[in-house]
C-alpha cells in the first residue's frame, strides 16, 4: 500500500503503509524432544477432518480445537471469515489492515499451540454490524460464500462445526452470517451447478454438521470432556487451550489455565453418516474414514504404525528410524494405490495438488496420505537427533541485495550422519559427515525471496473484500516464510531437515532474541500522524508533516524526500536531502500551508535514491 494521505469529511490526512506481518512475530521452529516425538507418533493413522467456522480471530472454541487436534489427533482447522481488521487494539495503535495483520499472526500463533490449521475468506472486517442485512451491504453474499465453498472443497472436512447460531441472538451481523454460511456450505459444497468445479474445486460432501453449544448445554446433543491430561507433556488439554486463547493479545484475551475435567457441547443439526436416529456417543459416530476401509494396504500400513509406536523409546528415538522409514514406504504405497512412483505419488508427497477429476473417496485417501507422509517426515527429523539452524547476517534484507546464509547442523544423537547442502544454483556441496556431538557449518549466498508482506494485501481491496483470492491452504503455508531445507542420512535413512531462516542476536537482559528474516523494500517511507487527521475545509491550514525514512541497502546512499500535495496546499520546500544509513530511521519535516475544499484528498511522501523512487513503507 502506498504511503499516502487521505482526506475524509472536511479534510483528513492519513498515512497508509503495508504491515510487515512476520517482522518480529513468533518464529515457527522445528520441533524437537520427547513431547514432539510422542505427539507425532500418537497422531499417525487418524484420518478424520473437522472444520470450525466463525467470523473473527478469537471467535473460535479453542477448547474444542485443542481437544480435536491434540487429544483426538484429528486434522482440525478454523475458518475465520475475517482477519479482525475492524477490532480494537490493546497493545498498540495499529488499526485497519495493520491490525488485521497483527491478529492474523496471533491466530497463527494460537494454531501452533492447539495444533489446528487456519483459513480465511476475503472479507474485510469493517467494524461492528447490527444485523446480517447490514453485513451483506458490505460483503456480497455469493462472494464470501464462494470463498467458504473453496475452503471446504480443498480441505474436505468430514465434520463441520459452526461457532454461531446464524440467528439475531448472535448479536453481531458478522457472527450471524458465519453461522448461516456454515450451514449452507454443508449442502453447497456438493452443488457443482451453482458452484462449478472449474471455479471452486471438486465437489465434497461433509457427513455431519454441528453447532457449538458450549454456552447452552441444555440444547446440546453431545457433550465431551475436553480437559484430558497428557502425562508426557505434563499438561492438560485445558491448559493448552488457555495458552492458545491467550495468543489474542491485541484483544486482551489472556486466559487462566483450566485443569481437570472441562466439558464442551455441540448440537447435531444435519447428518449423512450412520443412523440419524441413533443416539450419539462420539463426534465421529458413523463417519466413514479411509483407514476404516480394511483393505490389505490399509492393514499393512496400520500394522507398521502399530509396530513403530510399540518400539518407540522416547529416550532414544533414533532407534525407531528404520520403522519410521518402513511406515513411510507403506504410506506412499497406500496413498498412491500401489503406484508410489507414478504422478499420483507426487500428489501424495505434497508436491502437486489433488486432481479435481479424482473420485471423492480416492481423494479422501490421498488427503489422509499427504498428511501422514508429512507427519512421518517430521517424526523422522525429530527422532534423528539432528538439529538444523539457518541464520542470516542481518534482520532486514532489501529486495535485490545479497546476504549471507549460515546453515548449522548439530548431531545430538549417537549415530554418525551425513548431510548434503544445496547452493542457490541447485548444485550440491560435497556431502559431509557429522560425528555424534559434532556439527556441520556451511556459509552460502542467501537465495532470492519474495518481499515479506501480508499476501492478502497485495492488490488492495475492492470495497470490503480483499482483491487477492482466498487461500485454499493453511494460512501458515500460504504465508510462504523463508525456510531452509537440508537432506541428511542417518544409518542410510533419509531425513529431511527444515528450519525457518532467522536473524539471531544476544540481548543482555533477555538472552538470545530470534526474529524471522524480512525481505523489505530498499527504502521505507511513512508519514507520522496515525491513520487520519482532520482540518477545517476552506480555512487556512498550517501543519507540520513529518516523513519517516529508513534505508535498508547494504551501504549508505544519498536520497531526496518530497511531498506530493493536493491542490490548494504547498510545502515550505520542494525536496529535502537525506543520507540513508542502513537500518537507521530518520525524520524529515515539511511545513504545509494553504486551504482545501471539503472532500477527500491525498498526500503522498516519496523518496528518490539511485535513480528510483519509493512511496511505500512498512511497520
Regions found by a protein language model. Give the residues of each.
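Acidic, serine/threonine- and proline-rich intrinsically disordered appendage/tail regions
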Residues: 479, 485-552, 619
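Active-site rim/loop-helix segments in enzyme catalytic domains that contact anionic ligands
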Residues: 27-154, 176, 183-187, 191
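Low-complexity, acidic Ser/Thr/Pro/Gly-rich terminal tails and inter-domain linkers that flank the onset
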Residues: 355-400, 504-538
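Bacterial N-terminal signal peptides
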Residues: 10-25
